[in-house]
Amino acid sequence: CACLVGSEMCIRDSIRARGADRMSSFGDFISLSDVCDKSTALVIKREVSDGVIAPGYTDEALEILKAKKKGNYCVIEIDPSYEPAPIERKDVFGITFEQGRNELHIDDDFFSNIVTENKELTEQAKIDLAISMITLKYTQSNSVCYVKGGQAIGIGAGQQSRIHCTRLAGSKADNWWLRQSPQVLGLQFVDGIRRADRDNTIDLYIGEDYMDVLAEGEWQKFFKVKPDVFTAEEKRAWLDKNTDVALGSDAFFPFGDNIERAHKSGVKYVAQPGGSVRDDHVIDTCNKYGMVMSFTGIRLFHH
């Protein structure tokens, strides 16, 4: 969760960060890059969260957060000027592993090595790809990240194969988009339903287990009016409207199947290290769909 200067921007970005995956953000730990003010604290107060870390808190914000979870909410203040040691060390069963700290710096030339026929990388695409790289820098490998409009919308982390990362992140990106469909926005929930229950209900409604909330005797628990089934054809038609999505990968794509899956979720821009013996196949698949792909030459593994 990122926070910018200014109360309104801070709140907006906090909400967007959590909205990337409403299911996984349940019981999260919130990280803010600026001082937490009263308005942001009020937003955090209503969320199911285990803690927050920020470079500072206003007096009003601190009083609000101190009362959360009956005083057991974890509130951490960090020194924004702190510089970690240049060498990272990890002890595993008596063996010490050392490596240089990840100091990835993304500048205007970071995505300049475009290897596809389409080389039109927009400014928004550069921003989105940069966000994907930053997200991957701190995400358990193997990982893939989908980004749209300055917001991560699907993160697939900790998988044992690249294609499973792409599928997992893609399914989350699809769910993010489906939640904005007319079918979901038009749902009439019963009065007093808790937000977490509403999120879970939507997740079931847009998924394969929709009858869990639409069966007779069940739908009445969640809705005032029984919704129509959100058919596979309707979902596909809505997903096809999601375009200009950016995708980053923390290591190279070994085969073009990752690009095929990414295309189904509206991906147009791709950034990955490159270096696979099948790079030509991956590039050809991107060219088939008119995608723009950059080879960064940098692997972002995090274990």
Predicted regions and their residues:
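C-terminal structured "cap/appendage" subdomains that terminate the fold
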Residues: L247, A251-M291
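Short, compositionally biased leader-like segments
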Residues: E88-K126
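Phosphate/diphosphate-binding loops
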Residues: R22-E88, P273-H302
